[in-house]
Amino acid sequence: DINMLFTAGAIVIPGVGNIGFGITQMDYGEMDVTTLEYQEGTGEKFKATDLAASFTYSRKIVSWFAFGSSLKFIRSNIWHSSASAFALDLGVLVNTNFFSFTGKDQDGMNIGMSISNYGTRMQFNGIDSYQPIDISEYEEGNYGDVAGQFRTGEWELPLIFRIGVAIKPIVSNFMDVKIAIDALHPNNNSESINTGISVDNKIPGFGVFSLRGGLKALFMDTPQYGTTAGFGIQVNYLGNQSINVDYAYKDIGILGNMHAYTVGISF
């Protein structure tokens, strides 16, 4: 099984903005070590993991415009080899009163744009790439085990430009409905579109119960994604504080189905 853990936190500093951090960990589990000689396995096991740690700053300049940026450290490990990189995310959000039934900017059309993973290249290095080499195996009198190293290739991070639009066709004291659509332009795949809908049912004295659904990777040449669905519960307490519990289901094609669980606290 593949397990992913995401942990994040943020704090609002008056007059400064929002400061946040996040850690994403991916564990691909244990796998058998194989070689050309022992293709069924040597009896050893190895693990592969990924880690991304981010530091984020964002600020609302005016009531209708906000921006943010994240500095990320990314590291990938396979057995005794690892690769690392630094990357930057940049984004802006514009709230307009277009299609706003209340006349408020936050209830109108929201337009967002972002650039993700603008950073350095990655390259695997480690003791697994060290191998003894006989540079002249058919000649006598030379060193038979010269220290050598396989030089792995470099690769770029998946740079993604994204633009999205969201509207609220229904805004009331008991229910909000939001429809969103994103267009993606990555450097390592074809362009695609994500779309989704969220129905928030407001329960007086309790909180909010949300139902969500969407479609991912529309118009991608070879999509490996399908339908997404989920729900969320927000329980309010002590005025403006809340506990949030969310569940999401995602179809990932050849990798099967993914189930995601989130617990959050706002105070």
Per-range role (PLM):
Residues 1-267:
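Subset of outer-membrane beta-barrel
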